[in-house]
């Protein structure tokens, strides 16, 4: 099975949670499927971070260099959609990539799944900042959610937000899949040097190593 992931962020260009999410998702899917990644940010140089097998990076189209940023995004989306032929499923992340996933699904008659990391209707302040660009991003996101075969929400709260923002979406198509943690990256340090570094780090942060520690990984919001 071939799965094409479509994303704005991918190494070395990660600046938020969505990029971390896609990077880790690609890692765990590769042993299970033929995974292709279509990412913004231009081609990755061989041997550098993000230049994994099956990764294609796309630069903004030079013809749209002076256009609104949302139109530049759509230009990349169109190019990505045209390169998803042969995929069995496309999976997009954030509004930047949602239109590419939506169009690729229509063009190739394959399911388009999207993961909700944020929602444009819940960011009305962007209208003042981006003007017409916000209208375009909202339109693209709405089209993608309306046509998606499935929508993944990272929590029950996000699922409620999706259904409130896009009431036209069938609730049966919105599934909750909580974010996970790769526990291999969370283990007791081994060796004298690692133990010394761990002790120094705890001391620097004011953490008492004799007391139990709970680690929270997530977003703190009101």
Label the model's feature ranges.
Residues 163, 181-203:
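Acidic anion/phosphate-binding donor-loop and adjacent secondary structure
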């Amino acid at each position: 099975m071939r799965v094409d992931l479509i994303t704005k962020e991918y190494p070395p260009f990660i600046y938020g949670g969505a990029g971390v999410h896609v990077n880790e998702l690609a890692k765990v899917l590769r042993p299970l499927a033929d995974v292709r990644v279509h990412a913004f940010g231009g081609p990755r140089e061989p041997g550098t971070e993000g230049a994994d097998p099956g990764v294609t990076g796309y630069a903004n189209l030079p013809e749209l260099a002076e256009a609104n940023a949302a139109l530049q995004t759509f230009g990349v989306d169109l190019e990505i959609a045209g390169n998803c032929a042969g995929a069995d499923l496309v999976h997009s992340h954030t509004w930047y990539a949602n239109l590419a996933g939506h169009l690729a699904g229509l063009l190739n008659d394959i399911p388009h799944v999207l993961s909700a990391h944020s929602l444009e209707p819940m960011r009305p302040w962007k209208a003042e900042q981006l003007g017409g660009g916000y209208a375009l991003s909202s339109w693209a996101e709405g089209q993608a959610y309306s046509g998606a075969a499935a929508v993944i929400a990272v929590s029950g709260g996000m699922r409620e937000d999706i259904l409130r923002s896009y009431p036209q979406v069938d609730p049966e198509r919105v599934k909750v899949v909580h974010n996970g943690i790769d526990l291999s990256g969370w283990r007791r340090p081994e060796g004298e040097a690692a133990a010394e570094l761990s002790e120094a780090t705890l001391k620097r942060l004011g953490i008492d190593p004799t007391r139990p520690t709970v680690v929270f990984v997530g977003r703190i919001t009101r």
